[in-house]
Amino acid sequence: MGARSHSTEPLRASMKPCNVKYVAGSLLACTMLMAPRLALAGPPFMTDDPEPVEYRHHELYISSQLVKTQDGRSGTLPHLEYNYGAAPDLQLHIIVPYAFNSPVHGQRESGLGDVELGIKYRFMQETDSRPMVGIFPLVETHTGDASKGLGNGATQVYLPVWLQKRWGKWQSYGGGGYWINNAANARNHWFFGWQLQKDVSEHLTLGGEIFHNTEQISGQGGNSGFNLGGFYNFDKHNHLLFSAGRGLTNVNMTNQLSSYVGYQLTW
């Protein structure tokens, strides 16, 4: 979700660095990395967008995210995200998280989490009458130790479609897709999200999102939530991203509190 500068110009277009979506439905069962944001998804939000990094440009994020449930806290401290414009309309993506899991009744664990790999492709440009459209398939590897709550325990695949439209100082993006997850007790599920943001000044953009997951862990049920946040452009290369929110349904089991803060370098 998140701040995204796909060129060396100040961030104005979207509020999402990239993808880190940690969905902690049961800390004792697993910490699920989704796009995203919590979010391994579109920093600083769970919802992502179709806009790739410009050709031969780079984005590097150093970020941390947290999710709190009735079972404890989990997240990243930090995670590194890198995006590269490998071709016109095509972006390569990787996230390497240092994850932590701190259950209410149990030992705090930390270590390598599930590495995320992805390719974003924009196949429709935005015009006055139509939105930008793209796809951003992701693979969540199972590099994290699931027995310690640092990973999912099996590879996940996410197949989303994203749309984006801008009107002056306002911009909105959203969409969703299907998660394929073969981990024990996990269910394949859908994620949908929509975001709206406004350029408050040359340096500051603020926005919010709503999102919904269908059931991810057997017997847990689906969940909905929201985040409020934004990004601040210090200059054309250096950016601060931030968000916080909570669940609206199934709150205690899935999201009593979530937060994201990150530094983004673009060149």
PLM ranges: what are they?
Residues 40-267:
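Transmembrane beta-barrel domains of Gram-negative outer membranes and organellar outer membranes
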Residues 5-27:
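Bacterial N-terminal signal peptides that target proteins for export
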Residues 35-36:
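N-terminal signal peptide c-region/cleavage motif recognized by signal peptidases
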